[in-house]
């Protein structure tokens, strides 16, 4: 039987640690940490975990930082990816994205919402658990994972497949505006290649223009995007052309190849095989003898480890009556005296591997808001850090009590 959950004390402690979480988050933001360059921020997180009293902290061969609280037989994990995207056009920022900014309510900087704020709240949730003696028949694993922005879920493929770590469920701390999120659409990265024959541009009839051959394909892709699958909860599948490439001997020549990249979002019931086949079936694709394929990812992590995978990120969701939803709803109601909003992400998370590939339930609750992700002047809310730290401290006991 789980311990009684001291919700009031947990929330008071979370409020007490607002300044510490703010400082720690700003420290992380000040360290540029794009995918495959996370070494410094990983070591900064390890330092903070050790400072607040985690029982064990280690960095795995891929470069993920793993912190443990407790020694119980049942394992629950909470995850934050700690890499960020770049800053884009610096002229679009009103403040330095790494120096950041701070007001009484806000913290600004690259990674504040997406998603180093989640890490700040998790680390101090660990301290709250230690302060209040909330350890029970569980072990809490807090992960700071790498390369998510490059290849979402690859870090957890490694953790599960190579390290043999398999929690009973995982809380994703991606931004949810302090709502409970229970699913997301999947995605895949598709490429279409068309071949042509070059010749001098003064007599184009002698060649076979690959760009012209791609034109009808683009039109049919746009039409296909209007008739993709639909799910009542996750919404519709989508398709957009995100990149276009060509080769040509010169600007005075016919292009001899053309390729496009496609960002395909998969709703419930859609498969990677079906997504490729529906493109291969397009008349313009067949007429051009185009090759339709899926991208692969094999970029080394900051430690030099290569863990290749195909660029397919499965759709996932848990049902409203799932134990993970109940555990988070009960924790939220105990802390705040009202029911949380239960919804879904628009973007993708590490859940694509944790649940999408490996069937380990995932549930989301995080500080910050989705529209802040990858945007200039990114920010998060200090109150969100407090709310999430309290939730993360209460969730393990709420889970044990829910069963």
Curated annotation (Swiss-Prot):
Zn(2+) 1 binds at residues 81, 114, 174. The keyword Protease applies. Binds 2 Zn(2+) or Co(2+) ions per subunit. Keywords: Cobalt, Hydrolase, Metal-binding, Metalloprotease, Protease, Zinc. Pfam families: M20_dimer, Peptidase_M20. Zn(2+) 2 binds at residues 114, 149, 374. The keyword Hydrolase applies. One of its GO terms (molecular function) is acetylornithine deacetylase activity. CDD domains: M20_ArgE_DapE-like (cd05649). The active site is at 83, 148 (proton acceptor). Its cofactor is Zn(2+); Co(2+). InterPro entries: ArgE/DapE_CS, Bact_exopeptidase_dim_dom, Peptidase_M20, Peptidase_M20/DapE_YgeY, Peptidase_M20_dimer, Peptidase_M20A. GO terms for biological process: L-arginine biosynthetic process; proteolysis. PANTHER family: ACETYLORNITHINE DEACETYLASE, N-ACETYL-L-CITRULLINE DEACETYLASE. Belongs to the peptidase M20A family. This is Uncharacterized protein YgeY. The gene is ygeY.
């Amino acid at each position: 039987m789980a311990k009684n959950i001291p919700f009031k004390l947990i929330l008071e402690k979370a409020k007490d640690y607002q300044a510490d979480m703010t400082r720690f988050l700003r420290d992380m933001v000040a360290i540029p940490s794009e995918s495959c360059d996370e070494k410094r921020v990983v070591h900064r997180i390890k330092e903070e975990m050790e400072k607040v009293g985690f029982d064990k902290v280690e960095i795995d061969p891929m470069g993920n930082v793993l912190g443990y609280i407790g020694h119980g037989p049942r394992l629950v994990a909470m995850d934050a990816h700690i890499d960020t995207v770049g800053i884009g056009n610096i002229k679009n920022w009103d403040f330095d994205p790494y120096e950041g900014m701070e007001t009484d309510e806000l913290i600004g900087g690259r990674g504040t919402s997406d998603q180093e704020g989640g890490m700040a709240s998790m680390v101090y949730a660990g301290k709250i658990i230690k302060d209040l003696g909330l350890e029970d028949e569980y072990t809490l694993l807090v992960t700071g994972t790498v390369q998510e922005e490059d290849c979402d879920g690859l870090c957890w493929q490694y953790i599960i497949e190579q390290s043999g770590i398999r929690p009973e469920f995982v809380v994703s701390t991606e931004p949810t505006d302090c709502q409970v999120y229970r699913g997301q659409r999947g995605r895949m990265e598709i490429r279409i290649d068309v071949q042509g024959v070059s010749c001098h541009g003064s007599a184009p009839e002698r060649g076979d223009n690959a760009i012209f051959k791609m034109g009808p394909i683009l039109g049919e892709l746009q039409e296909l995007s209007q008739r993709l699958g639909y799910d009542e909860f996750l919404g519709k599948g989508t398709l957009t052309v995100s990149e276009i490439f060509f080769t040509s001997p010169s600007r005075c020549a016919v292009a001899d190849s053309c390729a496009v990249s496609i960002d395909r979002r998969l709703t419930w019931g859609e498969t990677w095989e079906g997504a490729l086949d529906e493109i291969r079936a397009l008349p313009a694709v067949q007429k051009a003898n185009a090759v339709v394929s899926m991208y692969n990812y094999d970029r080394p992590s900051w430690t030099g480890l290569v863990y290749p995978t195909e660029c397919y990120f499965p759709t996932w969701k848990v049902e409203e009556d799932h134990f993970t939803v109940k555990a988070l709803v009960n924790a939220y109601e105990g802390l705040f005296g009202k029911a949380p909003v239960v919804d879904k992400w628009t973007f993708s998370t590490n859940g694509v591997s944790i649940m999408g590939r490996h069937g380990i339930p995932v549930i989301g609750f995080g500080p910050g808001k989705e529209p802040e992700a990858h945007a200039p002047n990114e920010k998060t809310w200090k109150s969100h850090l407090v709310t999430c730290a309290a939730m993360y401290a209460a969730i393990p006991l709420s889970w044990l009590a829910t069963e």
